[in-house]
């Protein structure tokens, strides 16, 4: 992986590596430059529309869409001229969810994700089955983040 694009910012705290960042393009910044990091990132579009590029594939997104970017994947976020997008980045280390090496979920699902074996991001659009379930998970994470506070 190209080290020039490696984001090394610590998200959350060392003992609890989780944070939610509300963002708006173009209000907060004009775009999010191409980068990668070791954390999992879930991008939930709250309002408007834009484009999320993961590796070499560009995904048009709009209000309600949820996109999961796996550790190590190059990604960028942008909007077209005159477009706006409000979204939140939910960023966390997969190690927070892992059990010991005997745990089936850790061995067969989380470790492969952490080791970069996932090749395609997951895009969940409003009209897809289970979107409502994922939306509720995002709402719970938001609620948890409000209770926990910053950092």
Name every feature range the model reports, one short phrase each.
Residues 1-66, 73, 107, 115-121:
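Generic protein-terminus/edge-of-domain signal
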Residues 2-19, 74-142:
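A hydrophobic/aromatic-rich effector-binding and dimerization subdomain
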Residues 148-151:
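N-terminal core-binding DNA-recognition domain of tyrosine site-specific recombinases/integrases
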